[in-house]
Amino acid sequence: MSNSAAVTPNDLSAFWMPFTANRQFKKAPRMFVGAKDMHYTTSDGRQVLDGTAGLWCVNAGHCRPKITEAIARQAAELDYAPAFQMGHPKAFELANQLVQLAPQGLDHVLFTNSGSESVETALKVALAYHRVKGEGSRFRLIGRERGYHGVNFGGISVGGIVSNRKMFGTLLTGVDHLPHTHNLAKNAFTRGEPDHGLDLADELERIVTLHDASTIAAVIVEPVAGSTGVLIPPKGYLQRLRDITKKHGILLIFDEVITGFGRLGTPFAADYFGVTPDIMVTAKGLTNGVIPMGAVLVSSEIHDTFMQGPEHVIEFMHGYTYSGNPIASAAGLATLETYKEEGLLQRGTELGPYWADALHSLKDEPNVIDVRNIGLVGAIELQPIAGEPTKRAFSAFVKAFESGFLIRTTGDIIALSPPLIVQKHHIDELVDGIRTVLRAIP
C-alpha cells in the first residue's frame, strides 16, 4: 500500500491516540501523508496550510533538507551512544550552542526527550538544589491556574488545567497555584501585553506568607501560556514574579517549550520580556519537531552548587536513555543553524505588526469575543454554545481542515502559531480562511 492510499477505519483501532476523541476521529479520520515548508499533504492529495507549526514545534517549516540530511548522515555514522559515563561530540556542541543563544547566566544544559520530561527535570533540579544547599524544608512547588507543563506527574501537579488533572486522583503534595491572568472584561482585543493584571503577581506574596518562604522551592510559569489559549502576561508581571522569587530565595522556572526558538521574535521569551529565570525549559522547536528532544538550561549558581562533593560521586541522580541522543543532537544543530542562516528567530518581530493587523481584522466576525497576539502567535476566542462548551471551536477546526488549513483549538479558543517561514500571503490566506469558517459555522 502506498503512503497516500486510503486508510479504512478498521486499520485504526490499535493506536490509542493522545488528546483525541478516538471514537469520533476513527469514524472520519484526518490523515497527513507528507509535508513540505508551509503545507501538509493529506491522504486524498489535498494541500493543507499549516497554521500551527504542527504542535507549536515546526518553526523552520517542514522537511527542510539541511535538517533531514543531517539526521540521515548521523544515523549512518553513529546511531546511538549512551550518555551515562560516556559521551559523543555533538551533544557537547549542541549544549554549547544553546548556552550561547540563551540569556546570559544560563550556562549549563541537561538533555531530555520532550517538554514533559524537561519540566520533570527542572522540578527535580529545583528540589535537589535546595537539599544540596541544606534547605531540605523547601519542598513546595508553585504553578499557575491554566498553566500547562506537560503530562507527567510533576507537570500535571504544577499545571493548572483541570481536565488534565482530575482523572488521576492525588498528585504531588505541597503544590499551590497562582491565579491566571486572563481577564476578558478588562483586556479583550489587546495587542501584545495587556495593561491590566500586574497585581496578580503579588498573589505570590500571599502564597509565601501562607506557607512560609522556607518551604517553597520554585515557581514555574509559561511566559506566554500556549496550550490553554495564548494567555499573554500583563505588563510588568514576569518582572514582578522575578523580584518576589529573588527576595525569598525561591527559584523561578520558565517553561519555554512553546515560546522558545523565535516564537515571539527573540530567541526566547525571557529575551522578549527582559526577565531571566534560574531554570529554563525547552523542547519542540529545538529540533524543529523532527525528532524528540528537550533541553533544560540552568544557571551557573545552580550547577556549581551540585559540584561541591568528591569528583568521583555522581552529582545529580537523573537522566534518560536517550539524553543527548546523537541523531537528535544532529537535528538540533542543523535546526539552530537554519534559524541563524535564515534569520528566523527575528521573524516574529518583523512580521508581528502585519500578523496583528490580520488577526484583529476578525474582531467583528460572528461569535468572536477576543483576539490577542504577540510575536507570531495568536488566539481568537469564541463565545461558547450554551451547554456545549468546546463544540463551536471544534466545528471551526474540522471546517478549517476541510477548507485546506490547520488550526489548533483549546476549549472555545482558536490558537495559531505558524512556522516562522510564513509569508504575508500565507497570513492572508490563513486569516481569510478563518473568516470564512467563522461565518459558516453555527
What do these predicted regions represent?
Residues S2-P442:
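Conserved N-terminal phosphate-binding loop of PLP-dependent enzymes in the Aspartate aminotransferase
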